[in-house]
């Protein structure tokens, strides 16, 4: 077969990839195809950050499934004019890597007080002394982190409190609810001082812009709203999603807003232009949560049995985590120590090394005494300001606090085995 014939095959692979909506933009091909297009079709590795099918320096690799062997068999490989590694060389290097060891996590405290599911948790990361929770019981409760004792209960919503956001620059907290309202709370007076009206249905998510005095909300009406905190006016409405929006996150630079939705997409928004600058369509089901890395310019997203990380600002796929057995993933959180936590509907707590994608610990939570086993789902999570404590809100109406075992070592507590796959790990 001539090189020209191989390039025709390459064009066909990318035509199929586009048809299957694996990539939104194909004017610049990705450096490595992260997912197999078809088990019986080749995967292209292109040299450099961008390539076109006219470049001759590429490798054709065929994924073959043999009994007991999931491997990569090199069918054809052209010389790489740039001296880049082949797919096989990259895979071998990945196999030889040793992922970072992390100490295992264990339960240290169970906090009772809510009379409904704990839907959301927000941490005060300025002083790192208290946190707030919202529940199906329509209340917001503020707790002392060190003692676990209740400080105050806030009542103003008429329905479930779905999300909370605490300002790092002002003594304000924002809450959103199924009652269609957005409320601003004065934390010095513990009272609601502003209401923001404009959503047509339940509001599911809220976040505060880190540098501009605006708050961003979204929910069942499928639009993202940007509000001026002081005037209470919606300065911008961003349509685009085809279903209810599950989460919004704000960043100080573009994309200044990231949103996820029931329509299985993630949108990166340009607030200056007032439109989405990129749409990520790799997930196949409802994207239930997104979490921004505290120090790396990237974020993670989660849907049922699927966790992925993305490089910002353009939204390139970084890692497809091995998460096919995690059931419905409701929440993900990342700390500054590169630990990614995922909490599932079935009560599973799963911990990954964020950089390598290594799943190093997984176990089930324990429901509160008197609660049925079905009430052990994990709905919300956050790390404290140090990243050393993990807080989870659960369906048994409790908040649980988890810590790493300070006495553990790599010899006494080895992590789960490292079994990387070329099509799922960051290269």
Curated annotation (Swiss-Prot):
It comes from the Eukaryota. Its main location: cytoplasm. GO terms for cellular component: catalytic step 2 spliceosome; cytoplasm; post-mRNA release spliceosomal complex; precatalytic spliceosome; Prp19 complex. Associated with the spliceosome. Belongs to the WD repeat PRL1/PRL2 family. It is found in: Cytoplasm; Nucleus. Keywords: Cytoplasm, mRNA processing, mRNA splicing, Nucleus, Repeat, Spliceosome, WD repeat. Residues 404-427 are annotated as: Disordered. WD repeats lie at residues 113-153, 156-195, 198-237, 240-281, 283-322, 324-362, 373-412. Involved in pre-mRNA splicing and required for cell cycle progression at G2/M. One of its GO terms (biological process) is mRNA cis splicing, via spliceosome. PROSITE patterns: WD_REPEATS_1 (PS00678), WD_REPEATS_2 (PS50082), WD_REPEATS_REGION (PS50294). This is Pre-mRNA-splicing factor PRP46.
